[in-house]
Amino acid sequence: MAKARSTTTGASVRARAAAKPRSARATARPVSKSAVKPHKRHRLLGFLATMFALLAFAGAAARALPADLQELPFAPIVVSATPWFTLLGLIALLLAIVSRRILAALIAIAAIACNGYWQYPFFYSTDPLPQAAQNAVAAASPNTSDAYARVMTFNVYKGQADPQAIVELVRDQRVEVLALQETTEDFVKKLNEAGIEHYLPYAQVSSSDGVFGNGLWSATPLADPTDDDVNSSASFMPGGTVDMGGQQIRFVSVHTTAPVPGYWRQWKRSLDELGLMREHTDTRYIFMGDFNATYDHTPFRDFLGDRFVDAARES
């Protein structure tokens, strides 16, 4: 009996030993190339998520820079794209989730949170227009004796805009005060020929270089007109006072220096010069025109201070 068990055990060992080479050959198969592709794609998505998240965060950081640093080369241009960095952050967050990049996701969330906080007031107003104002501007014809008015501003880009189209907009939108920037003598002449004086007969136009200027047109008289209300280094910014329901409102046609290479510092200076108008506390101002800046630019927010408000943000 013991011998039989011993023989059986030896046969079993030999059988297992003989099976080993077959098992080794089975594990030597080459890895399929298709199995590598998802891993490479995963790494690419992770790289893009990280890059987009860093760019979105850099955009948010640029928006938070103090005024003196926002005059650095190209900083104003980057800041002007602030709302778009929100979209870039959302794309980065989606890619980070797909590729499981936690750090990239956290950076993207931080950028989205900052930009969302800054842009939210532009989409939700806590102080809507009074019903009386809505009724006034919705009337078939403007009432120049009340305290409400529709105003409009255009940069006509070196006098290349269509004067007839502007006059038609003034008529159709019942505009009572119009501000134009980069006008020329020829453009103003064509504007008069198109009939602007029929709707806005009072005007004040001025030019600092004799070529391009800024102007104001009004349905009611412009009291105390000036060629340059701001004493700006950028351009003459004409002003005039309009009686609106017994309230004297000072309108100014604004055109600051553009933030382009070689003029970064001049751009900030022209906004700082506007900021000096906060000291005129006895005058109620409406500044209309081409500020070459948005609310995201620190120098623009400094100009507003606690005295002025941005109409786009308030509306």
Residue ranges of predicted features:
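N-terminal export and membrane-targeting signals
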Residues: 32-51, 97-105
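Soluble catalytic domains of enzymes that build or remodel membrane lipids, polysaccharides, and related
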Residues: 151, 157-171, 180-315
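N-terminal signal-anchor transmembrane helix
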Residues: 98, 106-172
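Internal catalytic or translocation cores that form aromatic/hydrophobic pockets or channels
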Residues: 175
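Membrane-embedded alpha-helical segments of integral membrane proteins
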Residues: 47-96
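Glycine/proline-rich, flexible active-site/cofactor-binding loop segments
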Residues: 89, 95-121, 231-250, 254-255
